[in-house]
Curated annotation (Swiss-Prot):
Protein species of origin: Fowl adenovirus A serotype 1 (strain CELO / Phelps) (FAdV-1)
Record carries keyword Protease: yes
Regulation: Requires DNA and protease cofactor for maximal activation. Inside nascent virions, becomes partially activated by binding to the viral DNA, allowing it to cleave the cofactor that binds to the protease and fully activates it. Actin, like the viral protease cofactor, seems to act as a cofactor in the cleavage of cytokeratin 18 and of actin itself.
Other remarks on this protein: All late proteins expressed from the major late promoter are produced by alternative splicing and alternative polyadenylation of the same gene giving rise to non-overlapping ORFs. A leader sequence is present in the N-terminus of all these mRNAs and is recognized by the viral shutoff protein to provide expression although conventional translation via ribosome scanning from the cap has been shut off in the host cell.
Name of the protein described by the UniProt record: Protease
Active site: H55, D72, C122
Gene Ontology CC, one term: host cell nucleus
Molecular function GO terms recorded: cysteine-type endopeptidase activity; DNA binding
Swiss-Prot/TrEMBL keywords: Autocatalytic cleavage, Disulfide bond, DNA-binding, Host nucleus, Hydrolase, Late protein, Protease, Thiol protease, Virion
Length: 206
């Protein structure tokens, strides 16, 4: 098995005692952020629950700022997400917008990769973003001590050895961060490291 399960991600984030409303872990049928008054977040898979899932992405909504954040550890565009996973998030974005007093919000999304394609750690990176949103709601995508654990790499550089090394270091730093900050991760780190390991998906190295 490669990657983190729904249960593992829920338990990992439960160990962080989040102060905002973490809605949970969902497959691609996530309904959206339907309460226009409450800061909330979720981890959403690009696949269906029946398929076993494919790739985890972190989402968060800050109603005070009128912003929805989308943290994809690969930073893929909508077009690339469709090419790779046959998934679109238009429906839940639309439902979120319709619940807002003025029926609009700003989408802020990651555009660079922090994860190597050979890795199965998308869930751990997405969970790191959820903690970043919890602690630094005004700047969850960069510029705070949680999310700056990782460094973004432009897509055209992802398979260049020096930049691949950066992505590999991101994963090691993320393991270290979770070890330091989560009792759940410490108790289950052998299993979590094994299931999310670098080179778990070596065929994705080109």
């Amino acid at each position: 098995m490669s990657g983190t399960t729904e249960t593992q991600l829920r338990d990992l984030l439960s160990s962080m005692h989040l102060r905002h409303r973490f809605l949970g872990v969902f497959d691609k049928s996530f309904p959206g952020f339907l309460d226009p008054h409450v800061p909330a977040s979720a981890i959403v898979n690009t696949g269906s629950r029946a398929s076993g899932g494919m790739h985890w992405i972190g989402f968060a909504f800050d109603p005070a700022a009128g912003r929805c954040y989308m943290f994809d550890p690969f930073g893929w565009s909508d077009q690339k997400l469709w090419e790779l996973y046959r998934v679109k998030y238009n429906a839940f974005m639309r439902r979120t917008g319709l619940r807002q007093p003025d029926r609009c919000f700003t989408l802020v999304r990651s555009t660079e990769a922090v994860q190597c394609p050979c890795s199965a750690a998308c869930g751990l990176f997405s969970a790191l973003f959820i903690v970043s949103f919890d602690r630094y709601r005004s700047k969850p995508m960069d510029g705070n001590p949680v999310i700056d654990t990782v460094v973004g790499v432009k897509h055209e550089n992802m398979n260049s050895p020096p930049y691949r090394d950066i992505l590999h270091r991101n994963q090691e730093r993320t393991y270290y961060w979770w070890t330091k900050n989560s009792a759940y991760f410490r108790a289950h780190q052998e299993e979590l490291r094994r299931e999310t390991a670098l080179n778990a998906l070596p065929e994705n190295h080109v």
